[in-house]
């Protein structure tokens, strides 16, 4: 090892590791010197990692215990030593030339242009092509030098790949000069004595040890990211540009790391499960499903899968949370993530959980509840719940209120949001954990030791279902339980879900074959067993909704006007936005229904208007509204299916797949009311028996290819599987009603069962749909990570251009703005005004209608892009005013040309 005496440090011709910077000011006013030496930043991050193990943050000490290092001090020293390697790629001359402070001996060389390679990949290359041969750098072990190098090789991607993806493996690279390599070697040799207790376990080179390291590398690599993030904060680690003794700086940065550790909220203490009333005081008598999960034997070791299939009103959500609390209280998890199909359903579930979730933990604990989806910052209730994680452990704890909240540290990034004890969000946020998205390892860490609770899983298409199966398999392999909720699943769907769990547990479990009257149903799968349970049904959730048929829009309009004349509230659920806008205009033009009694709700509204309309919809049609519901009409699209708890006297729906019609019918006479619409506590509903009227093509026993498209062109585009649409109409005509729960399985299997027979007229389209089904699943499988190689170089291509959790058409964001006297302002007012002014539409729709709008252009647009940090190539700002000809109105939304 080269020692660096003062004379050497002052020699302008000799480069030492004190001549390499790691962080710069980058416009930050405070934070210490102009730059931070690379050696000090490396030790800052190492100190964070050392203390994270000592405190068992995110289960780090538990992971090392699984790896055979049960002594916390020894494990902490190994992790700190490993973190000293995380930025060795920054010793590259190509990186150092990005910033050349005059005090350092590295000056601008003759060569200025280097291939752009991340310092993560540079560091991994330096290990493979130089440092791996420096035996003196490696910890002690009983393993031979060759085997020890092979073991450390597995850990190098974990530490160098700390920017959200593993490093790339490269062979030809000339970004390092010889003195750069020597400085990196000298630094790593200098820090080695700081960690005298490290001893590499010999079994790490066994097949079992290698497999375990690869499995845990996904989680440990995420903690490297967290150590680097916090270790880079100048709030705790101010920049230091001058050399000093390594041991002295290590002691100094350990003290700083103690303070930085307070950004991680303390692990909450779980409360015992003391019965259903602790969680839900309003439940006097559990539903049969809730009683079933109360009685269920959950004592088996290892992960468990629960599939709860029951009707609307059976208390599935409460049953799932009861089950989750029982599992958490039994030490089988520390928290849960509740995944829902849409942002609207996630927002609604967040509101419900706010009243319940603290009961999962002891009163003195301070757990976090996080809303995780891309627009969560626009939800006022969530923003009000934030408390600063930085203040935990401060000298003013009495200033912090012990109410529900979520650590700001968790909330400032969707990447970290899943790390909170309780998460609520779109299922996509969890699915991204098993796909090659950047920082997927942070999501995996967040889901570790958590129950995955997914609702409305019947709504997943072939692509999403395949990714969900990959997520279930990964959760099971990690020893985590899964709870799935659905109205009804087909046998094929259930088979695939159970098979995914079985792969994760390396078992042979198979889903039971269910008959058409096996409903409601609870499927319980463990590592070695499958148990099925029939669930009883309460009389008050047994319902029969008769089905009627309409064959023209004129018939539908007449039925709406008739309902209004009788003082009833009614909805028409259309399959396309354009159809909804068109019929809304027709109803207004006829003048029979006053504009004040007519609502329009679809997806092409700005976020601010959409929130307003949803609030108004609940006020008019919600559970507790009575007088204001009379003679009210809402024309809407699929946004109404899952997002809001509304109760309608009558309903018309465009023909759609049977599972969606069942979902829509759930909004028809949802709560018990008297003849005047007043809510009743119990007894019979006094309104006319519920009837779902369906606008559909005239029935044809032998339909042709154009059967659906010729009658309902827009609906045919939205739901291209016309054979399933025809099967839906057939089974509903045969049954004459939607009878729940008795006919639920029959309805689903009659449309989605593997043995259904399609008419000859749909032969070509059916072949196309079957081909699309397998193509979509194949694409999803391509995007689900193969975790077996571990967090390693070149395991998958990260961030492919079209990577998405959903195989829907790409959408674009449009910003609405006003421009008065040259001043550009957002359409919305209040907090997050620009975000609340966004409308999202299909890219093809925008391409077709773009020329119908006035757009912000020129210098004003350029300045807006700079201010809002938007890409000018991607951003679109629509100028709006009070004139509806501008293409947007608060009443109709983004219009375009509606036929």
Region annotations inferred by a language model:
Residues 2-271:
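Accessory nucleic-acid engagement/destabilization modules that flank
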Residues 273-309:
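Conserved pre-motif I regulatory segment
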Residues 301-324, 460, 486:
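Walker A/P-loop
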Residues 335-357, 369-380, 489-493:
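Conserved Walker A/P-loop ATP-binding site and its immediately adjacent core
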Residues 353-421, 427-431:
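A substrate-engagement module of RecA-like helicase motors
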Residues 445-451, 458-533:
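Post-DEXD/H (motif II) to motif III coupling segment of the RecA-like Helicase ATP-binding lobe
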Residues 494, 544, 554-625, 648, ...:
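C-terminal helicase lobe and adjacent C-terminal extensions/tails of nucleic-acid helicase motors
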Residues 505-580:
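Conserved interdomain linker/interface between the two RecA-like ATPase lobes of SF2 helicase motors
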């Amino acid at each position: 090892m080269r020692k660096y005496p003062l004379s050497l440090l002052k020699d302008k011709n000799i480069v030492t590791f004190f001549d390499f910077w790691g962080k710069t000011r980058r416009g930050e006013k405070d934070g210490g010197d102009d730059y931070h030496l690379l050696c000090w930043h490396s030790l800052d991050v190492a100190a964070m990692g050392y203390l994270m193990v000592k405190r068992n943050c995110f289960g780090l000490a538990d992971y090392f215990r699984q790896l055979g290092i049960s002594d916390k001090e020894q494990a902490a020293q190994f992790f700190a030593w490993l973190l000293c390697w995380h930025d060795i790629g920054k010793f590259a001359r190509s990186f150092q030339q990005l910033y050349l402070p005059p005090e350092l001996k590295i000056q601008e060389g003759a060569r200025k242009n280097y291939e752009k390679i991340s310092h993560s990949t540079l560091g991994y290359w330096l290990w493979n092509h130089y440092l791996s041969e420096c035996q003196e750098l490696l910890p002690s072990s009983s393993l031979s030098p060759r085997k020890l190098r092979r073991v450390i090789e597995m850990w190098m991607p974990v530490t160098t790949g700390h920017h959200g993806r593993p490093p790339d493996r490269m062979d030809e690279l000339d970004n390092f000069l010889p003195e750069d390599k020597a400085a990196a070697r000298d630094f790593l040799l200098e820090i080695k004595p700081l960690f005298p207790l490290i001893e590499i376990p010999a079994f790490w080179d066994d097949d079992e040890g290698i497999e375990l390291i690869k499995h845990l590398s996904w989680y440990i690599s995420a903690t490297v990211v967290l150590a680097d993030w916090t270790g880079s904060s100048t709030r705790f680690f101010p920049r230091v540009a001058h050399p000093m003794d390594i041991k002295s700086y290590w002691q100094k940065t350990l003290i700083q790391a103690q303070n930085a550790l307070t950004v991680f909220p303390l692990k909450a203490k779980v409360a015992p499960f003391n019965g259903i009333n602790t969680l839900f005081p309003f439940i006097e008598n559990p539903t049969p499903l809730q009683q079933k999960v109360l009685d269920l034997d959950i004592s088996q070791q290892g992960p468990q899968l629960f599939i709860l299939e029951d009707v609307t009103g059976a208390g599935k959500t409460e049953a799932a949370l009861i089950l989750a609390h029982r599992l958490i209280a039994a030490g089988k998890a520390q928290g849960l993530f509740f995944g829902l199909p849409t942002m609207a359903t996630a927002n609604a579930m967040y509101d419900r959980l706010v009243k319940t979730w603290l009961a999962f933990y002891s009163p003195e604990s301070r757990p976090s509840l996080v809303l995780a989806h891309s627009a969560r910052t626009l939800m006022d209730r969530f923003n009000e719940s934030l408390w600063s994680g930085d203040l935990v452990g401060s000298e003013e704890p009495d200033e912090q209120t012990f109410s529900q909240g979520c650590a700001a540290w968790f909330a400032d990034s969707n990447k970290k949001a899943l790390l909170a004890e309780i998460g609520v969000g779109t299922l996509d946020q969890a699915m991204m954990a098993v796909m090659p998205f950047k920082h997927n390892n942070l999501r995996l860490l967040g889901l570790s030791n958590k129950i995955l609770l997914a609702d409305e899983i019947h709504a997943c298409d072939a692509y999403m279902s395949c990714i969900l199966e990959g997520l279930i398999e990964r959760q099971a392999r990690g020893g985590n339980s899964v709870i799935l909720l659905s109205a009804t699943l087909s046998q094929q769907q259930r088979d695939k879900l159970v098979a995914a769990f079985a792969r994760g547990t390396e078992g042979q479990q198979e889903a039971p074959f269910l008959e058409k009257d096996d409903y409601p149903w609870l499927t319980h799968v463990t590592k070695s067993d499958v148990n099925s349970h029939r669930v009883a049904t309460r009389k008050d959730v047994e319902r029969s909704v008769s089905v009627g048929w309409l064959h023209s829009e004129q018939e539908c309009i007449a039925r709406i006007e008739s309902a209004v004349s009788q003082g009833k509230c009614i909805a028409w659920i259309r399959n396309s936005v354009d159809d909804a806008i068109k019929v809304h205009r027709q109803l207004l033009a006829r003048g029979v229904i006053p504009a004040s009694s007519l609502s329009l709700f679809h997806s092409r509204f700005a976020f601010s208007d959409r929130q307003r309309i949803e609030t108004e919809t609940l006020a008019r049609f919600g559970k507790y509204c009575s007088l204001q519901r009379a003679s009210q009409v809402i024309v809407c699209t699929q946004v109404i299916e899952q997002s809001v708890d509304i109760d309608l006297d009558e309903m018309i729906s465009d023909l759609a797949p049977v599972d969606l019609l069942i979902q829509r019918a759930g909004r028809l006479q949802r709560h018990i009311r008297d003849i005047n619409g007043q809510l009743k506590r119990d007894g019979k509903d006094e309104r006319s028996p519920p009837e779902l009227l369906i606008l559909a093509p005239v029935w044809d026993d032998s339909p042709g290819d154009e059967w659906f498209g010729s009658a309902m062109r827009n609906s045919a585009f939205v739901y291209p599987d016309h054979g399933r649409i025809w099967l839906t109409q057939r089974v509903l005509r045969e049954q004459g009603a939607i009878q729940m729960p008795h006919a639920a399985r029959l309805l689903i299997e009659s449309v989605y069962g593997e043995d259904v027979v399609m008419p000859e007229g749909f032969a070509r389209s059916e072949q196309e749909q079957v081909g699309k089904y397998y193509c979509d699943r194949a694409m999803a499988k391509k995007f689900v990570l193969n975790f077996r190689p571990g967090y390693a170089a070149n395991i998958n291509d990260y961030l492919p251009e079209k990577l998405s959790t959903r195989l829907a058409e790409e959408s674009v964001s449009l910003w609405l703005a006003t421009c008065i006297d040259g001043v550009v302002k957002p359409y919305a007012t209040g907090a997050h005004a620009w975000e609340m002014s966004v409308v999202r539409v299909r890219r093809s729709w925008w391409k077709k209608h773009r020329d119908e709008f006035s757009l912000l252009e020129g210098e004003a647009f350029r300045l807006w892009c700079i201010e809002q940090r938007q890409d000018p190539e991607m951003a679109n700002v629509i100028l709006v005013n009070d004139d509806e000809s501008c293409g947007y109105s608060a009443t109709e939304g983004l219009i375009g040309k509606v036929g």
